[in-house]
Amino acid sequence: MIRNPEIQFASADAIAAFQQERLREEIAYLYENSPYYRRMFDHCGARPGDIRTQEDLRRLPVTTKTDLQLHPQDFICVPRSRIIDYVTTSGTLGDPVTFALTEEDLDRLAYNEAESFTTAGCTPEDVLQLMTTIDRRFMAGLAYFLGARKLRCGVIRVGNGIPELQWDTIRRIGPTGCIVVPSFLTKLVAYAEEHGIDYRCSSLRRAICIGEALRDTAFGNNTLGAKITELWPELELFSTYASTEMQTSITECGHHCGGHVPADLILVELLDEQNNPVAEGEEGEVVITTLGVRGMPLLRFRTGDICIGYTERCACGRGTMRLSSVIGRKGQMIKFKGTTLYPPALYDILENIPGVSNYIIEVFTGSLGTDQIVLRIGSARRDEAFEKEIKDTFRSKVRVAPEVVFEPVEYIAKKQMPQMSRKQIKFVDLREQTK
């Protein structure tokens, strides 16, 4: 794999030429080593030499999650003896998919995360506290650890949860940054306030935030980002976007104007429902082609994530594409009473209602064949006035009011973290079961 972190600061023409060369190499590798993609090329009547630019990719079909689930072995490009690590996707939109990684792929992950941390302002002088799991077949936790080592930062592998242990570690070692699911920061603050910890004077100065959006499409803070910043203004938050399929992390810089796509690791297209490119500034599905992955590379993979792309050069000097936070998942789009909604918009509203301790959003198909939404709210308040307040808030924000059902906080907490899950569940889609 050719690594060129400086290419992101080059001219648009130089970036395009660099990526075209990497793309041609990737296409040749796929045709030679991937049973799935060789079959796809032959079926389309295409040859590797036909694909020379990103525009040429449109001649090829997209790869879907279903393709991965139906033909997992056909995507593997190396003999079993070269596979040294196995990970799985989280299974947000279906059965988890297993990915096989080679030594080169782990080196690539380390390089990517080291560059991501650098984009977020980290240096070898930093000590990073890893507040996420590194086990349970989770690629990202391992990638963060490898990337921090690559950058020669200190690393503290605390794992997820347990605020008491997190604060004890912060007190003992004095980390300067953390890798964390941002909503957990609110729990750290709550624990600190309950136990007299002066968290605003702690050693932490930056948080690399994973798994949840912090920004709106105008790059301002969403409700979660604003809440954390209000509670802990000394802590600078950096938004990231990544997935197991991408084997790449996209991270924002200190200007907080979208995540910078690493040009030497991935190609990104933003497509509409007909697989046509969307105009700049319009929402589109993120479709990725990995560069330099050896074990299970992907070509034109539909992530299901809806984002907005920007090509204007950032104030930091990088000229590669920038991506907004994920607006929603294509498979999770809800059409409720004539209004198109994505779960993150509903999360944003609920996170900002005082008295809502936790929640799960359920969507199902009603008797008339239309989408219906139930908000299961964990709260100490369970009166009609609070229900009306919640519904009125939704009407003012998104013009529609879902059904509200109050549940014990403990019940919702258990539903959010099933025994085999490594991700907190806030959205349950029952539409296939209730058609």
Q: Where do the model's predicted regions map?
A:
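Conserved AMP-binding/adenylate-forming
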Residues: 219-313
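Short, well-ordered beta-strand segments
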Residues: 127-130, 287, 376
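Anion (oxyanion) recognition and catalysis
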Residues: 31, 149, 262
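AMP-binding/adenylate-forming catalytic core of the ANL superfamily
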Residues: 178, 292-400, 422
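Phosphate- and divalent-cation-binding pockets in alpha/beta enzyme and binding domains
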Residues: 36, 40, 165, 187-188, ...
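Generic structural signal for residues in well-ordered beta-strands
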Residues: 155, 237, 268, 359-361, ...
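Active-site phosphate/ATP/adenylate-binding loop shared across adenylate-forming ligases
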Residues: 4-6, 63-232, 250-257, 406
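Nucleotide 5′-phosphate-binding alpha/beta core
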Residues: 1-88, 94-111, 115-119, 124, ...
